[in-house]
């Protein structure tokens, strides 16, 4: 089958991109290929469901720009489509004095990014927002909320198809042949021809990109599993909304935090441990070929050397419920190991370059017949409509 545009990947970014293209130009023939039998199965459907504000990201970066624009677009979309969401606000809490300068830097960054109402709060105010939370300093970020991103992605898919887009489920991409003005995409259920391939394959985005070019790719996806605990129901009162620690500025993860969920309940987590399989949601899941690729990547070896202490701490928390609880106790001293019930896990696709740099920003590249979204971790779900709009602009310039 022939299409002017084919999107690979039925996560929230791929679906948002397809929707944006069909909204901008309904006459373009667009298809989306997804290897699973449903959309939003992986990163989109296995995250903490937070609507991010843009607090953490370097001013002028793609993350800052797209998160702030995406936040407003997402809220409007949810309102228009009657998707349940709540703007709960959150607190970011320094639990030690040495974290206060980092907290102040976060506040300054948020203000530079245009956040409204974000401010330092007193410890009395902290007790008002989160009565059981402890710390030496805190900021309050009202532009933060919660939503079920799987519902959002499914609505993107519905509207994309109403506008004439086609979604092909169960179509795993096996091979891409590049010709002068077209690409032939071979899948597990047949072949497709397209003028423009848009790669939104998430955990396999580097693999798809490599299929589409002869040169060796200079980045590789490293899968990090994030594990969650649920707070047992009778102890959910310990958390009113969202409580975050001050993140390690050298590590691209936000640290274990507390999140009230849209479906009900409270989750604690995630940690960040190397997954031994790209879609390895359990400790026992191993793909030896994928693991060997990760371990042999020069960039990962440098990351492991640089962050080995942090990595060992995360691994210890993965296997020790007590250690996980101890990390949570820094924010809520009353939390007990017995309050935690093992929850689910997600796997984050984190791009790593050859020099050992964990890419801190979104990474979108284009070549002759393709656009590749190579790094779209958090806050990509919040930013999805904005990222989709950016990719849409790049795509429509070709027609």
Swiss-Prot record:
Needed co-factor(s): FAD
Keyword Oxidoreductase listed: yes
Example of a GO MF term: (S)-2-hydroxy-acid oxidase activity
Keyword Glycoprotein: no
EC number: 1.1.99.2
GO CC annotations, alphabetized: cytoplasm
Xref: InterPro entries: FAD-dep_OxRdtase, FAD/NAD-bd_sf
SUPFAM superfamilies reported in the protein's UniProt record: FAD/NAD(P)-binding domain (SSF51905)
Recorded superkingdom: Bacteria
Catalysis: reaction(s): (S)-2-hydroxyglutarate + A = 2-oxoglutarate + AH2
Record-linked Gene3D superfamilies: D-Amino Acid Oxidase, subunit A, domain 2, FAD/NAD(P)-binding domain
Pfam (any one): DAO
Record's keyword terms, sorted: FAD, Flavoprotein, Oxidoreductase
Protein purpose: Catalyzes the dehydrogenation of L-2-hydroxyglutarate (L2HG or(S)-2-hydroxyglutarate) to 2-oxoglutarate (alpha-ketoglutarate). Active in vitro with the artificial electron acceptor 2,6-dichlorophenolindophenol (DCPIP). Also displays a very low oxidase activity in vitro on L-2-hydroxyglutarate with O2 as the electron acceptor, but this activity is most likely not physiological.
NCBIfam families from the UniProt entry: PRK11728.1
Family, similarity comment: Belongs to the L2HGDH family.
Designated name of the protein: L-2-hydroxyglutarate dehydrogenase
Organism: Indibacter alkaliphilus (strain CCUG 57479 / KCTC 22604 / LW1)
Lineage of producing organism: Bacteria, Pseudomonadati, Bacteroidota, Cytophagia, Cytophagales
């Amino acid at each position: 089958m022939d299409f002017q545009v084919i999107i690979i990947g039925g996560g929230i970014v791929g679906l948002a991109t397809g929707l944006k293209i069909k909204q901008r130009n309904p006459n373009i023939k667009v298809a989306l290929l997804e290897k699973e039998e449903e959309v939003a199965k992986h990163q989109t459907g296995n995250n903490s469901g937070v609507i991010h504000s843009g607090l953490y990201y370097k001013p002028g970066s793609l993350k800052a720009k797209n998160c702030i624009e995406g936040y407003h677009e997402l809220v409007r979309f949810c309102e228009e489509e009657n998707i349940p969401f709540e703007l709960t606000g959150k607190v970011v809490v320094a639990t030690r004095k040495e974290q206060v300068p980092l907290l102040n830097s976060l506040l300054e960054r948020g203000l530079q990014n245009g956040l409204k109402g974000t401010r330092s709060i007193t410890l009395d105010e902290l007790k008002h927002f989160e009565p059981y939370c402890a710390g030496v300093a805190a900021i309050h970020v009202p532009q933060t909320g919660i939503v079920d991103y799987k519902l959002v992605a499914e609505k993107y898919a519905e509207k994309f198809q109403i506008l004439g887009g086609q979604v092909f489920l169960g179509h795993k991409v096996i091979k891409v042949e590049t010709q002068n003005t077209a690409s032939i995409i071979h899948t597990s259920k047949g072949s497709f021809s397209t003028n423009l391939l848009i790669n939104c394959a998430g955990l396999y985005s580097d693999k798809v990109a490599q299929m589409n070019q002869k040169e060796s790719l200079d980045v590789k996806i490293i899968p990090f599993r994030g594990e969650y605990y649920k707070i047992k129901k009778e102890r959910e009162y310990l958390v009113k909304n969202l409580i975050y620690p001050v993140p390690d500025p050298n590590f691209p993860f936000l640290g274990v935090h507390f999140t009230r969920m849209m479906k009900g309940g409270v989750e604690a987590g995630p940690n960040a441990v190397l997954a031994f399989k790209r879609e390895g949601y359990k400790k026992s899941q191993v793909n030896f070929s994928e693991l060997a690729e990760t371990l042999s990547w020069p960039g990962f070896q440098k990351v492991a050397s640089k962050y080995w202490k942090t990595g060992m701490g995360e691994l210890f928390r993965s296997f020790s419920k007590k250690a996980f609880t101890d990390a949570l106790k820094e924010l809520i001293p009353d939390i007990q190991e017995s309050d935690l019930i093992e929850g689910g896990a997600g796997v984050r696709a984190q791009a790593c370059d050859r020099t050992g740099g964990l890419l801190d920003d979104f990474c979108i590249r284009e070549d002759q017949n393709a656009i590749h979204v190579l790094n779209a971790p958090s806050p990509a779900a919040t930013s999805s409509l904005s990222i989709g709009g950016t990719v849409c602009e790049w795509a429509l310039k070709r027609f």
